[in-house]
From Swiss-Prot:
It comes from Rattus norvegicus (Rat). GO terms for cellular component: actin cytoskeleton; apical plasma membrane; cortical actin cytoskeleton; dense core granule; exocyst; melanosome; perinuclear region of cytoplasm; photoreceptor outer segment. Residues 4-124 form the RabBD domain. The gene is Myrip. Pfam families: FYVE_2 (PF02318), Rab_eff_C (PF04698). A zinc finger (FYVE-type) spans 63-105. Residues 395-405 have a biased composition (Acidic residues). Residues 427-437, 450-460 have a biased composition (Low complexity). Residues 495-856 are annotated as: Actin-binding. It is found in: Cytoplasm; Cytoplasm, Perinuclear region; Cytoplasmic vesicle, Secretory vesicle; Melanosome. This is Rab effector MyRIP.
Amino acid sequence: MGRKLDLSGLTDDETEHVLQVVQRDFNLRKKEEDRLSEMKQRLAEENSKCSILSKHQKFVERCCMRCCSPFTFLVNARRRCGECKFSVCKSCCSYQKHEKLWVCCVCQQARLLRTQSLEWFYNNVKTRFKRFGSAKVLKNLYKKHRLESGACFDILGGGLYEPNLENEGSISGSDSTFYRQSEGHSMMDTLAVALQVAEEAIEEAISKAESQRDSLDKQNEASYLRDHRQELAEELAGTILQRIIRKQKDKADLHAEEEEPECTRPQSSGVKARGEGTAAPPGRHKARAALWRSQSAFSFTTEDTLKTSSAEAAPRQPKDRAQRLLEESALPSWRSMDGLDGKNLVPLLQSPDGNWMTLKDSSRQPPTRLLAKPKSRTFQALEVASSVASAYDELGSDSEEDFDYSEALSKLRPPSQGRLKQPQPQPAQAQSSGQGPLATSPSNPEAMCSDSETSSTSSSREAGCRAKLLWLQRKAPKNPSAEKTHLQGELDVNFNPQAAGGETSDSSDPEETLHTADRRARRWRRARVGPEESNRGLPSPSAYPPALHTAQVSDNVSETDISNEAQNSRSSTDSAEEKLRNRLYELAMKMSEKETSSGEDQESESKTEPKNQKGSLSSEENNQGVQEELKKKCSAVSLCNISTEVLKVINATEELIAESAGPWEIPPVSTDRDNGMFPLGTDQRSLDKQLTSLEENVYLAAGTVYGLEGQLSELEDAARCIHSSTGETELADLEDQVAAAAAQVHHAELQISDIESRISALTIAGLNIAPCVRLTRRRDQKQRSQVQTIDTSRQQRRKLPAPPVKAEKIEASSVTPIKTFNRNFLLQGSSTNRPTASTSNTKDLMEPVLESAVMY
């Protein structure tokens, strides 16, 4: 049964004799089936009756399931059937000696039916062979007869093919079913050809995928095709049959139109042309496009075939010609084959891999003759019948390059005005391919038209596209107000229009930097006035100090802006130091005026202001300059330099306060600290550089830990919001995120411990890192606090500023102390929760502390 059966050498008499034997076998089987059908019907009725009676428990215990007679003691005893497990009487069952059990009459008939119908044999053989016995013999004889008589010339294209008679697929599973379906011979032959072509196409796809061993996607594609070969072949054969039926209907309609009178033919054709031009769906053009193999499968035919095709394509309108050129320019990945005959009239496109050619004009009917010669007549039969020659057309889908990032971004945020004004052409050829969303940029032709891949890779790539879309949605702000704030922060911070457009510029001239800084400040003020007037529900900006607005803006600084600002900050450091020094002098004078006399009038203020009039500007210009420069000093290097200069300015301010207010109580200081002496073997400049680099690392580590703490808090909030219905995949993703965040926190802690060890080594070397207590004065003339001032060196005045403080926390807190460096500095969170160093000093120096917090 599994061997190849060759009946081509039989004579006509032998063939007729074999057919008579097979026919007699079929007649006997038909009679046997009629006889067994009555038995099957009786068994089915009995089974339905038992299923109803078995629902009543009392009936099952007291009566026989077959004859419904009641059980009596010693007269009609109850016996249990060994197969159906029902209780039956003595007359409805028999004892099987070899099995040693009672079997009811219904179960005996079921055994007899299985024995006579040979169901056990056919079920076993069908699992091993798809066609066997008389069906296999009749199939071969029938094919031979059909091919010799020429009845299937229209299906096979007038040529013979070599069928694989060993385990070939068919819709018939046994001899009887094949005999019953032998009447529809034309459709069966068509299905056999379609199945064979589908299997050959799948085999070719597998071999092509296996040839590319360096690609993991191709290997996965080959394994998927091998595992689902039968299902894919059946689906492809069904698609081919649908195309054949559709084409036959089109041919019937065409013949009906040809038979119409000449007077009514132009009107009907015009109506049909208008209907096809307006109401034809995009997928229709793809379904009716004629595809041919090229290079590996076909060789080009003679010139007369091309002339025939060009003659058929010549009567087209100039508008169609222009549309064809537009489609050709929109699809550069397909090479034009119009120059085959030198007349540029055949509208052909060739795929980039050289496996396919297609006609771009799908409105007309395909030519009567093929433009290429097939490698086998099986492909010729398929192409003539169904105009389908590619297994990839049904197996594959869009590749990963078809994922449109512009569509995802358009869903997340509205496009700009410049993009709305630009027209976005969409070629009709790209729309008709049914590839989903098209790329809006004409410079990305690969996203418009890509080769179809298999269903295995398409499903994985579609999942990847969905994952990318979800990733973009997570990155986008979910709240409109948050999005507005984010955009406002970008306008406030990003002062480099070239960098925003994708270009970088280095400004080394200090004068140009000052002019650009003034222009940026004016632009920033104009951009800031609009949102403040539009937000009616929010409090006025005058209710908050300027430093709070600066802190809000600094939270939205992007990484690109920070990198650009770090480059520009060095060139404008001198001007920033002067503005900061003037601003701090003014703040210090205001503090001294409030402390000395709370009831002084404006005349005393006018006396103290001329003392520092040399280095001060107007308060409005200083405020704007401070806000602009503070936004530029977001990098670690700039913060380190600014903190050093600010501490110097605070020193000078405190000295001015001490001179204007009166004598101060200075605690005794050691002699070598007053003289600024360092231990032997140490260099002041090298220690200064090392401490500067350590402070930069501290700033970077503090920012990293602060961001990681925010991520951990968000993850904790998300974990609390998870309900019991959360899927396992979401829980696994959350666990992975928590583990990654914990690993980053651990890495940051290791960096912090390394920095602490280096600081301790510098302390042992003789560098004083711990800050001193600030100079303060008593509110009343009776109480004075001890203040330690050190003017020997810059290293002895170093203090580490607090980590970044959010605007709302700074506004709500009434106490903002200054804290020295310790091991828990980087992990203490907000500065409002830290222990105070001196309660009495906090209220006097709260404004300078707010300024230092904003600078970070």
